[in-house]
Amino acid sequence: MSDPRRPLRVMQSFGAPRVTTNPYITMLDEALAATDGIEHVRFSWREALLGRYDVFHWHWPEVKLHGSSAVSSVGKYALTGLLALRHGLSRRIAVVRTVHNLDLPDDNAARLWLLRRIDRQADHRIVLNETTPLPAGTAQTVILHGHYRDWYGVQPRAERLRGRLGTFGGVRRYKGVSGFVDAYADAMARDPEISMIVGGKASSAELAEDLRTRVADLPNVVLELEFLSDAELVQLVTGSELIVLAYRFMHNSGSVLAALSLDRPVLVPRNAPNEALAAEVGPEWVQMYDGEVDADALLEALRAVRAITGDRPDLSRREWDDAGAAHAAAYREALRARLARVRPRGRAVEA
């Protein structure tokens, strides 16, 4: 950054977005491409290992370690190791990492070792909410997860069905869909007018079969255990009166933001991030339960959301133009620290 007039050349760890790419990545890609002072570079192995850039920005580095076969995975591991080596040796490439998840994924010892090495190389971290715990003195910028209003706004909406409880997204055990089904079964005994829809690809055939077995004798249940297109997702969410996300652990949830962006209230576990979200967007839009989701939580949340008088939650702090500018500021801070060979400590940089 010897010439302050030159745009920062920033390489992301993601390539060109595809149809199945996480919308967060696609919208970030668009926001960065439109941000002044940034030359936005998508990932390629050749450019990452041999090209010139000022900043490298990691998202989910574990994705780079897995190929389509065992041989491919070994090759990906070696390439990622070389990339980490380049970043570790360079005095002129800053490393930024977005903290999407708090914990490392379940993986083998070699991959976990490399992921920890990558994490230690970060000159600056971006966190998506104000409650993400990081070690004292970690240089960080809070950039709230952007909304999906523009992304889903082009899709036609469904008519909201009274009593319809919906959940969507990749169906994994930690997302608590089985517990939601059991709570729905108990709630049905008290209010036979409610209904339920589950949409999203199951992570395993065993989980899909377990859910089919659980709902086999339940009325008013729709299971769509396949990947949802944007149009299908919008139909599911807007056709529901309440979106239930009964995760066993929740920190940064794109599904919560998707539902709120489509003006549907959510029921989520009570924790610090969700309490902060409720205070931000309006508590009536973010219903919470303690412990495990149960029939009481479902029925009480339905009663509460029927009292909502506003048309939509307040997502004004989650504009993508603001996110692009905040990323640019974080990149400049990280590069200043790297060029000075001093990691910034003891202060956070506000977006």
Please name every model-derived segment:
Residues 209-234, 281:
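Nucleotide-activated donor-binding/catalytic signature segment of Leloir-type glycosyltransferases, i.e.
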Residues 235-251, 264:
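Acidic donor-binding loop of glycosyltransferase active sites
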Residues 157-176, 181-185, 196-197:
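Conserved donor-binding/catalytic core segment of Leloir-type glycosyltransferases
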Residues 119-153:
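Donor nucleotide-sugar binding/catalytic pocket of nucleotide-sugar-dependent glycosyltransferases
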Residues 293-297, 306-345:
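A charged, aromatic-enriched C-terminal amphipathic alpha-helix characteristic of glycosyltransferases
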Residues 195-209, 226:
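Glycosyltransferase donor-sugar binding loop
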Residues 228-240, 257, 261:
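Short acidic alpha-helix that forms the nucleotide-activated donor recognition element
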